[in-house]
Amino acid sequence: MVFERTLIDLIKGIRSHANDEEAFIATCLLECRKEATSQDADLKSEAILKLAYLEMLGVDISWASFQIVEVMSSSKILQKQKGYLAAVQSFKPDTDVLMLTTNLLKKDLMSSKVPEITLAIDGLSHFSTLGLARDLYRDVLILLNHSVPYVRKRTILLLYRLCLQYPEAISACIPKLRERLDDPDTSVVNAAVSVICELARRAPKNYLEFAPDLFHLLTTSSNNWMLIKLIKLFASLTPYEPRLVKKLIPSLTDIIENTHAMSLLYECINTIVSGNMLVGHSQCDKLASLCASKLRGFFEDTDQNLKYIALLCLRKLANTHPSLVSAQLDIILKCLVDTDTSIRLRALDLVNEIVNKENIRTIVKTLMLQLIVSSDESAVEDIRNSTATRIIEMTSKSTYMNIADFEWLLTVYVDLANIPGIDTGTLLNNQIIDLCVRVKALRPFSVDIFSQAILDPSYVSTTDCSVSEKRTDILPAIIWCLGEYAEFIEEYLDILDALTRPSFKKCSNLAHRLLLQAITKIFCQWCLEEEPTWGVEKFGLVKLWVEKIVSFIEQFLNFQDMEIQRRASEFYILFNQVSDIVNTSDTMEVLELQKKPPYIVQNTMYKLFFGEPLNPVAVKAQRKVMPDENLDLNCPINGVIEVPKELLENIIQSDDSLINFDTEVPSSGIDTFSKKQFNSLESVPVQRDLSSPFYLSSNQHTTTTNSEPENLNVETSMSDEAFNADKVTKVTKNKRRRKIFTSPSLQAMVVAQDEVPEGISLADIENKENPSNSNVYSLISLDPPLSTNQGSMGDIVLETKSPIRVEKKKSKKKKKKKEKTSGKE
């Protein structure tokens, strides 16, 4: 090239060669290599400047590190400036020539010219390493006494970088930084506060000695930016010095009441709610009320960021003063339906903390309406699922502590399942089952609404819907409850007919597993309920339904799911046993001998499914059972089985003889043992089978003819006394027989606690894990309700040893039945 390109020429050339930019840059790079080795200082510095520009385009210029150091050492400020600029951009911690810059940086730091000092400070802050920080931090400390405030400010900021690279320098820097807090220049003080604040984040306890000077700045400074830094610093110091709280509260209160800067106001409130300043003194309630009122003003602003940080502060405030946050429920509910997704999520987190018996209905209603409205919009699926999950969590919080009406809660769960576009099937199924297991008085109502759902043919036909229209599948919970609490079903045959519809083939595998078991339970309960009116007509119905159930179960024998196949095989054999008993040639003789349902249904199947009540078990119950001392869980049960060589040879020889036997024995030899003799031997039961309740004898209906009827009354617990009235009344043929219970609506709803192993208390392990909570007793107990604790309708009785109890309204239907029963008596 005839002439050298300047930086401006280089930029223009790159823009003009847009089509072949790489080739042009390669040409310029060759020129810069030649210029960088030139003896002309101006030409070399210009080449380094162009290389710095090319480095921003991604060109590697590490080969020019030594030439950059040469330009940095120039006595001319313009050339030195170009060298430092290239060094800042290209030097890395592993650059070899960094060791050559130590003396150069010392010389520039001690220069009498401010521009050279600032260049050295700026360069060192960018490419400092452990070695440079160790060798130069003492020289940098000298600059804290420089006469120019700008140099002092830049020096303080450089010290932060050096302390990070070389932590041993902190002990020497702290006294110097403390002196700069009294600097006459405000910018220097701001820099000192910033550095101290950043260093204190890593080890706050080491900076408690700064508290008097920092507090003086807090009370005298009018710089909002500095006040924010000071407040953040005190927030990190108060956990190590609780006495600072009393000193800070008046100053923070004064700032909150008088400032108009939202940023400063937020930092003050956040420091108070996060720094444990709302407990332990007489002004805590007044200060918390002031913070809550100021945070309310954040929601009136149009800035969405203020709403977001206000929700964060309110959630922290809810930990100490939930009642004050609950008073802001109206603005929180507005945030639940805000168009901003992040605000909705923060509002969800907040309402989960402040929910109580008074506001839970309002909160749940707002969330449900928000889900229904957003189902027609293109709402994010994760947000909808998160909202539905929060509804379930807040309603089941602390074992339904905030629930006064469990029937309302169950309808909420059912309505939640009917909202399209929500996928919380597993959680919702588990919650419905848990609710029915814990609250015994809720079971009749749950069976009633589940019966209505299962009788609707369209309820099952939702599997072919699109994702946006598909509803949460709670069929497993519905089927399980109908089978587990079949005694509350009113129309057994209608439910059995609904459960055996062909549309159930489209259900999930979990629903299929529970379906087979529920059908068996409902059939067994129906037979027991028909015992008082047993006759030819009922017997014929049983025969028809046994055939229908056998035909329905037969479809699942070859199912792909092994669990479904196993259950189908078990119940198929069980109903075949029932079919063999009821399908006799002389029906009248059977009716005269039994006068009741088959023994296998009345006794064996009943004990198989309804022998013991199903109670909730604590999650931590299993780990509280200590294993036996002689039990080694790490030892294999069988170990390594070694077969002796002689035994192995005998096994091989016996296998060979069996093969020869199969080929040599004539076919006539098989007939020597008649089929009749084989069946007679097969039918001989083992003695242990005769005493087993699960032994299904083929002639049980004839063996019990001369014996007295077996007492099938199951002993009930004290909590079941509400259902211990006479269950059966005489009815005519035209009048459907109904079971008469002592109305559960007249009794309190009891939420059952989790069961634990005998002799073990949940409080034992909790006291070990949480010693501070050793004196806290559970609000819910499994003890029977005391008559003296009967509350008014809808009240929850919270006592240390009494269960949660909810009075129910009297059911007109149950009341009429009770009057009829008393009249008959």
Swiss-Prot record:
Query: What SUPFAM superfamilies does its record include?
Result: ARM repeat
Q: Which UniProt keyword terms apply here?
A: Cytoplasmic vesicle, Golgi apparatus, Membrane, Protein transport, Repeat, Transport
Protein name, per record: AP-3 complex subunit delta
Repeat HEAT: residue ranges?
A: 131-168, 169-205, 207-243, 244-281, 285-323, 324-360, 363-400, 469-513, 515-547, 548-584
Classification via PANTHER family: AP-3 COMPLEX SUBUNIT DELTA-1, DELTA ADAPTIN-RELATED
Ranges annotated as biased composition (Basic residues): 807-819
Q: Which chain positions lie within coiled-coil regions?
A: none
Swiss-Prot/TrEMBL GO biological process terms: Golgi to vacuole transport; protein targeting to vacuole
What does the record say about its membrane topology? Peripheral membrane protein
State how it assembles.
Adaptor protein complex 3 (AP-3) is a heterotetramer composed of 2 large adaptins (apl5 and apl6), a medium adaptin (apm3) and a small adaptin (aps3).
The segments labelled Disordered in the record are 787-825
